């Protein structure tokens, strides 16, 4: 297996009730940037998505976001990231993220995060868990 160049992160559009979740997202963004690994995520500037993206940028990393047009119109996109891909639907967002990322990390989130993570497990059939 070659070097990992990009990692997708599925996580919540809210920070949640446990401050440790935001700390973990921040640390993940920092570690990815320090390792020279591009972050691929849902393109939002809010919630854990925003935390991980801003941490990667702050640490000198490259960040690619993929966001559906309807969320762009709601002004939740982070337009200050390295590159932002606008797609037509949530389904297309997931497809593009799978194309752009070599692997995925799943952080806390809601039903969308659960759906994305389950799809990843089914498609790639490989996973590891860390505590």
Which residues are covered by each model-predicted region?
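Short Gly/Thr/Asp-enriched flexible loops that form oxyanion-binding sites at enzyme active sites
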Residues: 50-55, 116-127
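Hydrophobic acceptor-binding patch used for acceptor engagement in glycosyltransferases
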Residues: 104
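N-terminal glycine-rich "phosphate-gripper" loop used for MgATP/nucleotide binding
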Residues: 87, 109-111
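Glycine/threonine-rich flexible loop motifs
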Residues: 17-20, 111-118
């Amino acid at each position: 297996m070659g070097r990992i160049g990009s990692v997708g992160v599925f996580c919540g559009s809210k920070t949640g009730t446990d401050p440790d979740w935001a700390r973990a997202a921040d640390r993940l963004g920092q570690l990815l940037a320090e390792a020279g690994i591009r972050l691929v995520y849902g393109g939002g500037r809010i919630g854990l998505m925003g935390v991980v993206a801003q941490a990667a940028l702050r640490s000198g990393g490259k960040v690619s976001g993929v966001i559906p047009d309807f969320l762009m119109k709601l002004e939740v996109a982070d337009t200050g990231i390295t590159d932002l891909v606008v797609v037509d639907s949530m389904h297309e967002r997931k497809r593009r993220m799978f194309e752009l990322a070599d692997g995925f990390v799943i952080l806390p989130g809601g039903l969308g995060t659960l759906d994305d993570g389950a799809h990843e497990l089914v498609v790639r059939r490989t996973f590891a868990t860390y505590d």
